[in-house]
Structure formats: structure tokens, C-alpha cells
């Protein structure tokens, strides 16, 4: 799979075909049997999952992708756990991409709608300023209206020069 910055590439296939498994292998959660994972020309295949995140891969799983008992802002801060710098400016960028999150920043994520929770998950994944964002079935369990809105947000993320694989 080849994904360049500013592109969206979708892996298609029936249930059980290995789409999620492939993403988990790219993130280092599963061992590769062959092939390699390269980001910006650097082979990261031998790196641990944490080192791959530091190298620029961010992943939003299909389920259990937010901390329901934490606020929106606390969820975003969790996405910055590997950052050594002041990440407040990145939180502001996330609020610009997803304005509703600014309004809801002190609200528990468990009280949000499905679409808003997905925005929190996307925002948290963007806190590391990834070069590659992997989304495992980002529209699972959301209504068609929310799905359209979510794709609008994914396109906004693409415009920030992030490669998106879903």
C-alpha cells in the first residue's frame, strides 16, 4: 500500500479479509511476515509500536477509540502523551478543525453523539502531528448524515498534508 501526504487511500474488502489486521501490522501491533513499513523514506519495520507513533503513524481503531469518562480536552491531551513540547497550540489547531469540540471541551466524551466522539478520536490521533493517519472503519455505527459530516472532516485533515489510510 502506498499513501502519499495529502492523499486518502482506502483498503476495500469483505469482512474478515484482513483490512484491520494489515493496519495493526503497519502500526507494529502484529508482526509482519513480509514487506516493510516506510514513512518519509525511512523503514520503520523494526520499530516498536511506540517508536512508530513517534515516527509519525497515528491510528484510530474502529471501536473503543475514546475515553468516555474523560472530557474532550483530556482525551486530546492523552493523544499528546509522547510529545515533549507545549502542545496547547496543537489543541487549538484541533479546535479549528473541529469547532464543536471547543464548545464541548469540558464535557465528558461519553455524553457526546457518535459523530462528536469520532471527532474526538480523530483529534486525539492528530495531536502527534502525524504524517500518516490510519482510520479503521471510521464510519462504523454512525448515521448516514453523520457519515457525510465525518468525511468532510477527513477531507479537512487531508488538506493539512496528512496521508490517510482507511
What feature does the model see in each segment?
Residues 1-166:
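Glycine-rich phosphate-binding loops of nucleotide-dependent enzymes
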Amino acid at each position: 500500500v502506498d499513501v502519499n501526504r495529502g492523499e486518502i487511500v482506502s483498503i476495500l474488502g469483505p469482512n474478515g479479509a484482513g483490512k484491520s489486521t494489515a493496519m495493526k501490522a503497519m502500526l507494529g501491533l502484529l508482526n509482519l511476515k513480509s514487506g516493510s513499513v516506510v514513512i518519509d523514506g525511512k523503514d520503520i519495520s523494526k520499530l516498536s509500536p511506540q517508536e512508530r507513533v513517534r515516527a509519525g503513524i497515528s491510528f484510530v481503531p474502529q471501536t473503543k477509540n475514546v475515553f468516555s469518562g474523560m472530557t474532550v480536552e483530556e482525551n486530546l491531551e492523552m493523544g499528546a502523551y509522547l510529545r515533549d513540547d507545549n502542545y496547547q497550540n496543537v489543541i487549538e489547531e484541533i479546535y479549528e478543525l473541529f469547532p464543536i469540540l471547543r464548545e464541548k471541551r469540558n464535557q465528558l466524551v461519553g455524553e457526546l453523539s457518535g459523530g462528536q466522539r469520532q471527532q474526538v478520536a480523530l483529534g486525539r490521533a492528530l495531536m502527534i502531528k502525524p504524517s500518516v493517519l490510519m482510520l479503521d472503519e471510521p464510519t462504523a455505527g454512525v448515521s448516514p448524515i453523520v457519515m457525510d459530516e465525518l468525511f468532510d472532516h477527513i477531507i479537512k485533515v487531508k488538506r493539512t498534508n496528512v496521508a490517510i489510510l482507511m
